[in-house]
């Protein structure tokens, strides 16, 4: 997705546009979801700025690209139904990658307190933002 400008000069008065020039309130659920997806993408970017193994880096970049595509679909509403199969396949691929990585480490038996290392803390933050976006989408 290419953005020409980051401002519109239209004076939004609490409104914004979805694709197709549909005007909605800035607290519309489409905008809330896009904000959460954008926040998740930013947290993943912070995580990628850390020392991440190449297999994890590949999965994170793949997730970032999917988040951009999902955000575009959310604001285009009508196209979303047509593209859900694409995201279902991509989700399965990401889950498969996560399963492989999970099998490479010993998993604790209970809940994990956020923290430890900076990448671990960012991973926990990404998880919580992702769960919020998921709740908003459903």
PLM region descriptions:
Residues 1-138:
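Phosphate/pyrophosphate-binding loop motifs in nucleotide- or prenyl diphosphate-using proteins
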């Amino acid at each position: 997705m290419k953005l020409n400008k980051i401002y519109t000069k239209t004076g939004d008065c609490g409104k914004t546009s979805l694709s197709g020039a549909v005007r909605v309130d800035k607290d519309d659920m489409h905008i809330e979801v896009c904000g959460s997806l954008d926040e998740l993408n930013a947290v993943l970017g912070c995580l990628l700025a850390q020392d991440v193994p190449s297999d994890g880096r590949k999965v994170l970049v793949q997730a970032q690209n999917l988040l951009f595509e999902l955000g575009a679909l959310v604001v285009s509403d009508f196209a979303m139904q047509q593209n859900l199969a694409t995201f279902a396949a991509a989700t399965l691929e990401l889950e498969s990658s996560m399963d492989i990585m999970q099998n490479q480490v010993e998993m604790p038996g209970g809940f994990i307190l956020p923290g430890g290392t900076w990448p671990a803390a960012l991973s926990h933050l990404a998880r919580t933002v992702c769960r919020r976006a998921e709740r908003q989408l459903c």
